[in-house]
Amino acid sequence: MRVGCDIIAISRIEKIHSRHGKNFLDKFLSPKEQILIKNPATLAGLWAAKEAASKALGVGICELCSFFDIEISKDEKNAPKLKYSQKITKDFNITQTSLSISHDNGFAIAIVAIV
């Protein structure tokens, strides 16, 4: 099992988004993921989730794992769900993933566990 964690100030993501708009979103979220954004807290949570997912691999966001190798969605109970690209799943021998996202007191945090 490997674990990754990321925390970010919601105001930081909000500031970047207000400055760069959709161009910022397009750099790390697919159109399907952009639909999940309800407010700055959910946007920050998505950022933290992708960062945590890359850290769980032990590589971070780089040439080995781009933002688009990581897909965030929701399950039938509206809980966050994580899926890696086929290449990442194969290269890192991933059989299971778990993602938790939370927001409180101006911060968003995400924790990812992979097996």
UniProtKB/Swiss-Prot annotation:
Give the keywords, sorted: Cytoplasm, Fatty acid biosynthesis, Fatty acid metabolism, Lipid biosynthesis, Lipid metabolism, Magnesium, Metal-binding, Transferase
Q: Which InterPro entries match?
A: 4-PPantetheinyl_Trfase_dom, 4-PPantetheinyl_Trfase_dom_sf, ACPS, Ppantetheine-prot_Trfase_dom
Q: Which major enzyme category is it?
A: transferase
Which GO terms of type biological process are on file? fatty acid biosynthetic process
- Catalytic activity line of the entry: apo-[ACP] + CoA = holo-[ACP] + adenosine 3',5'-bisphosphate + H(+)
Q: One of this protein's Pfam families, by short name?
A: ACPS
Residues that bind Mg(2+): D6, E51
Intracellular or extracellular location(s): Cytoplasm
**Segment forming the signal sequence:** none
Q: What cofactor does this chain's UniProt record say it requires?
A: Mg(2+)
Q: What is its EC number?
A: 2.7.8.7
Recorded GO cellular component terms are:
cytoplasm
The entry lists its GO molecular-function terms as: holo-[acyl-carrier-protein] synthase activity; magnesium ion binding
Its function?
A: Transfers the 4'-phosphopantetheine moiety from coenzyme A to a Ser of acyl-carrier-protein.
Could you tell me which NCBIfam families the record lists for this protein? acpS, pantethn_trn
The record's comment on protein family reads:
Belongs to the P-Pant transferase superfamily. AcpS family.
Q: Under which name does UniProt file this protein?
A: Holo-[acyl-carrier-protein] synthase
Which species?
Campylobacter jejuni subsp. jejuni serotype O:23/36 (strain 81-176)
